[in-house]
Amino acid sequence: MEIYMSVFNTFVEFVARIVAPMQRQFINFIRIAIFIVMAWIGGLKVCQYEADGIAHFVSNSPFFSYMYEKGPNLVPNDKGELVMEYTLHKNPEGKMVAKNIEWHKENGTYTASYIIGAIIVTVGILTLAGIWNATAGLAGGLLTFGMSIVTLSFLITTPEAWVPNLGGDLPTPAYGFPYLSGVGRLVIKDIIMMAGGLTAAAECANRILARKK
């Protein structure tokens, strides 16, 4: 048994010696990963389907709802129940419904999406720039952290983040907290972005302080 443990420990030390000197490269990889996600998702905000697809987040968020004209308004549905107006004008991805698109134009959905997308792409660029410029990278990392906090708040403000109880032939056993829907499962991953942003920011902060020595 001692022989096996010795071999195992030797292997672990061998791997550690390879990985340890690459810490800076791995942190740069975090920056690249954050940039890819930010640039891709932020860039897609100019697309109609993506702008429509964030309406539930924006309408329910205290940070963003002011960007919409109608989305947060309460209106009666076909059953006479009061619901947020955006719920009556959802466009499934890949489906074009003219009356819904017109409503989103009047709502300011697309303008808001362009603004949000530009902010996301800018944060991604600043984070990536941390590879070469510590000050820009510090700003980008902290903004990534802050943006992740806002995104994670959608778990609290967005009803669609949790599996609903839609009924059926049998009782629904798993709905509400802690049962994340597809929307919620997408949002919860921003915890990784939060950690990555802080890691990138801390490395830039150390480089800035090192200049003073």
Swiss-Prot record:
Coiled coil: none annotated. It comes from the Bacteria. It is found in: Cell membrane. The keyword Transmembrane applies. Keywords: Cell membrane, Membrane, Transmembrane, Transmembrane helix. One of its GO terms (cellular component) is plasma membrane. The chain crosses the membrane at residues 26-46, 112-132, 136-156. GO terms for biological process: response to hypochlorite. InterPro entries: RclC-like. It is a multi-pass membrane protein. This is Uncharacterized protein HI_0219. It comes from Haemophilus influenzae (strain ATCC 51907 / DSM 11121 / KW20 / Rd).
